[in-house]
Structure formats: C-alpha cells, structure tokens
Regions:
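Long helical/loop segments within the catalytic core of UDP-sugar-dependent glycosyltransferases
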Residues: 33-34, 119-120, 144-221, 363
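Cell-envelope/extracellular polymer assembly enzymes that use nucleotide-activated donors
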Residues: 49-52, 82, 226
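N-terminal membrane-anchoring/stem segments of glycan-assembly enzymes
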Residues: 1-47
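Short aromatic/hydrophobic "clamp" motif used to bind/position activated sugar donors
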Residues: 133
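A conserved acidic beta->alpha catalytic loop
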Residues: 70, 87-96, 113, 140
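Catalytic donor/gating beta->alpha subdomain of glycosyltransferases that bind UDP-sugars
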Residues: 154-185, 219, 223-295, 366-369, ...
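Conserved donor nucleotide-binding strand/loop of the catalytic core
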Residues: 80-85, 95-127, 173, 177, ...
Length: 395
C-alpha cells in the first residue's frame, strides 16, 4: 500500500506541476521579464522594401477571387508587391480564377501534382523576387494597412521575421467563441515574448521573413513554426506585429475537423523542433531555449499530465479522503465537456452560461485528445497525411 501511495503521489505531483508550469509560471515569468525590457516603438515606414506575397492553395476556387481582390487593395506601393499563387495540384477552377489576374502583379505557379504545402511554398519561394517573403493563407483577408504594419518592424536590421495577428471574423456559436478565446490568450503571450525579441510560436495565417533567411522546408513540418525557428537559429529576432491583422473564419469546421487539425499540427510541429533541436540548448540560446521547451514541448505533454492526475488520484483513494473530492472534480469537468454533445440529442437548450462552459470544455477536450494523438504519431514516426485543407464549409 505504501508503494502505491508513493507512486500515486509522484504521478499526482507531476500531473499538477506540468500544467502549472505551462499555463501559469511560464506566462507570468515571460511577463515579468518583458516588463524589465524597454519598449522599442515600431519604426515608421519611410521606405518600402519589395515584397513577395505567397499563397499556397489546393482546390480553393471559392476563395481566390476574394483573396486576390483583397491583396491587390492593400495599402502598399504596387510596384513593390508581387503576389504568387502556388496552385498545388488543383482539380477545380482555382487556376482559371488566378489566371484572370495575370496583368495585375499576380503570378500563377501551376503545380500539376498535389504534393503538399511545403512543396508548394518551396517552389514559390524559388520563383520569388521580393526582399521580404510574406506568407498568407487563402482564407485570410487583410485590412488595407496590414501589410505596412507587417513590414514596419523590418526597419530594425536585427529583426528577421514578423508574425501577424489572426482575428476570427465571426464569433457566432460556442465553439467559435472558445477558439477565439484561445487565440486572444495566445496573442497576449506573443506580445510579451515580442518584447524579449523572439517568439516561440508563429501564425501561418500571416507572417513574413527576410528572403535571405529562408530555409527550404523539409517534409512533414509546420511551415510557420519551422521558418520562425530557422530565423532565430540564424541569429535574428522574430517579433509580433498585432496591428498586422488577418481576418479569418473559424479554424475548425467541426469536431472531426478540429481533431484532425490538432493531431496534424502537433505531430508536424514536434518534428520541426526535433530537426532544429539545437534551439533547446540554453547554453547557446539562453531564456529562449527554456521558453521554447515549455511552450512547444511541455505544452504538448499536457494530455499525459491529465492522465497522471487521474491515475494518481485513483491510486490515492484508499486511505486518503481528500482524493475523493479531487476525483469528483475531474469527473465533473469531463462530464461538463461531453455534455456539449448530449444537449442536442436530448433536445434540451442549456442556460447560456452552462452552454458556454460546456462548449469551452468540449473544445479543450478535443484539443487535448488531438494533442495526445499527435504526440503518439510523432513518437511512432508517423508522417502527417498530405495537406488537404478545408477552408470553406463546403470544401
């Protein structure tokens, strides 16, 4: 019995300490350190470097007209902006839509075979002429000033890359609200990290790097995180420009899509970190190495922490009365999360607050399960399936 108590105590301690480190200690420490760093205002743009905006797309005909009209309406000198659309083995009318813009600084790269996003981006970069490479998704619409805001930090020669701010354009529905809440919290961490000069994450909806710092993307990585880390590895900063906004629809199209999306992102991002594991060496990269380890590796282990908490609680039930309330609290949390699926089946409309808590819990549970599957894929060396995005509800 003493042995089980010891094991249960260790499991419970680790299971509680890991979320505390990731969700409380790390953000608080980043915030406190960032406050001691003098704020550097973003330089005023007086010159406009040449920009190549790259959009990789697979069967995105429903999006291209809106996307290209939006890109061409950006407040940026047309002579300094080229738009490259890499059509990754499209079988719909994507190429026909893009071809109509051929006389307006829009270049179409026809990639006959569907080989995935990394191949499309590598091919497009090889054709790009801009000093800066801007990457933007087909479903991301930019306010007129966004490109100027994204480019402005490059006036500082120590900056090698800039991350934009994603904004969910419509927030109707509990799942959308939950995802928007997560994005808002993540953006706060980016803001504090940016004061330290380097982010530990990036956003594929809108970001930019210097073309001279581009590293060809290997298979099965997330392009945004891999390129951000490549910039840091080359000794440049990667910062956040919150005014460079990208308006997007809800990232998840439903529970199944969110699960698949989270699984793929986790496996691919861990693979990308493994390929650049030198960044985890604090002797060379100092505080950044610890932040990367906590925010991008330990965060992926949170599902295991929840399993340890449950397992530790069960082992401590005999002879420890305080373990029973802890078990009930966990069961209540899981019950609230999965009640989100139950309400429609039994025809009950829950009170607004209960419905919101239930939907948020369900979104968190989906993310936890998808993360667990992604970690499993990474440990088994299972490559994520080929990039086949769902950018509209009908695609």
């Amino acid at each position: 019995m003493q042995g089980l108590t010891l094991v249960g105590s260790v499991w419970l301690g680790i299971g509680l300490a890991l979320p505390l480190l990731v969700l409380v200690v790390n953000p608080l420490l980043v915030y406190l350190v960032a406050r001691r760093v003098p704020w550097r205002p973003i330089p005023v743009v007086t010159t406009f470097p040449s920009v190549s905006m790259i959009v990789a797309v697979h069967n995105g005909a429903a999006l291209m007209e809106t996307k290209l009209d939006n890109a061409l309406a950006l407040d940026y000198p047309p002579a300094q902006l080229e738009i490259i659309v890499a059509a990754d083995g499209c079988s719909d009318a994507t190429e026909e839509f893009v071809a109509r813009y051929g006389d307006r600084n829009v270049r179409l790269l026809r990639l006959d075979e569907h080989r995935g996003k990394t191949w499309a981006l590598n091919t497009a970069v090889a054709e790009a002429h801009g000093e800066l490479l801007v990457f933007s998704d087909a479903d991301a619409l930019l306010p007129a000033e966004s490109l100027r805001q994204l480019v402005a930090p490059f006036a500082d020669s120590t900056v090698g890359g800039v991350c934009g701010q994603r904004v969910i354009g419509e927030r109707h529905g509990a799942l959308r609200e939950a995802q928007a809440c997560y994005i808002d919290l993540d953006s706060r961490l980016k803001h504090w990290e940016s004061r330290l000069g380097t982010l530990t994450s990036n956003d594929g909806k809108l970001y930019a790097i210097r073309r001279a710092l581009f590293v060809p993307l290997p298979p099965a990585v997330t392009d945004d995180l891999f390129l951000a880390l490549a910039v840091v590895r080359q000794g440049r900063g990667f910062v956040f420009a919150p005014q460079a906004r990208a308006l997007i629809p809800t990232p998840s199209r439903g529970a199944g899509h969110e699960l698949e999306r989270r699984r793929r992102i986790v496996a691919a991002s861990l693979h990308g970190i493994r390929l650049q594991k030198v960044l985890l060496d604090p002797r060379r990269y100092g505080f950044f190495a610890w932040r990367l380890l906590i925010n991008k590796v330990f965060r992926r282990l949170l599902p295991l922490a929840l399993l340890l908490v449950m397992g530790g609680t069960l082992l401590l039930l005999p002879g420890h009365s305080w373990a029973w309330p802890l078990l009930l609290l966990q069961l209540l949390g899981y019950g609230l999360a999965f009640s989100h699926l139950l309400w429609p089946k039994i025809g009950i409309q829950p009170p607004p607050l209960l419905g919101k808590v239930s939907a948020t819990g369900f979104y968190v549970a989906l993310g936890v399960y998808g993360t667990l599957l992604g970690v499993g894929d990474f440990l088994r060396g299972r490559q994520p399936e080929k990039w086949t995005p769902r950018k509209t509800d009908g695609v």
